[in-house]
């Protein structure tokens, strides 16, 4: 699956609400901040068919050189792209979440640069944890 433009979280409004009162958990070296967004309430300019709006951040304070930050961003983005299909299937097959959209912000929390394999393990663990949290809310 491709990582398309309509999957990217670009709305500063949604990003600020994410950091004010969203759910979050860590899977070292990553931290996921997520929030459920009602698709109907979004302005037309932000609406997309994608069930997940995705953004990521690598801290400038930890990685001074832009080259290092860009390498980590590429690794995270590629790992997410390779693993998102399982997550999309879960959301599209569940009637409760057919009209919902989720905003994801992935923060890199590691102090050193990790390889793609280690980042991929973190993304897989993160997706697994998110699925468990969703299933827990479905049962309620």
Q: What residue ranges belong to the model's regions?
A:
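Positively charged, solvent-exposed patches that mediate nucleic-acid binding
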Residues: 1-140
């Amino acid at each position: 699956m491709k990582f398309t433009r309509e999957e990217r979280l670009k709305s500063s409004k949604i990003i600020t609400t994410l950091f004010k009162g969203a759910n979050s958990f860590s899977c070292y070296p990553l931290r996921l901040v997520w929030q459920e967004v009602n698709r109907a309430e979004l302005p037309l300019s932000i609406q997309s068919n994608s069930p997940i709006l995705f953004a990521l951040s690598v801290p400038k304070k930890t990685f001074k050189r832009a080259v290092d930050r860009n390498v980590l961003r590429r690794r995270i983005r590629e790992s997410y792209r390779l693993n998102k299909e399982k997550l999309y299937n879960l959301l599209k097959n569940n009637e409760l979440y057919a009209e919902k959209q989720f905003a994801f912000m992935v923060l890199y929390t590691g102090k050193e640069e990790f390889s793609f394999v280690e980042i991929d393990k973190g993304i897989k663990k993160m997706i697994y944890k998110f699925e468990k949290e969703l299933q827990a809310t479905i049962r309620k």
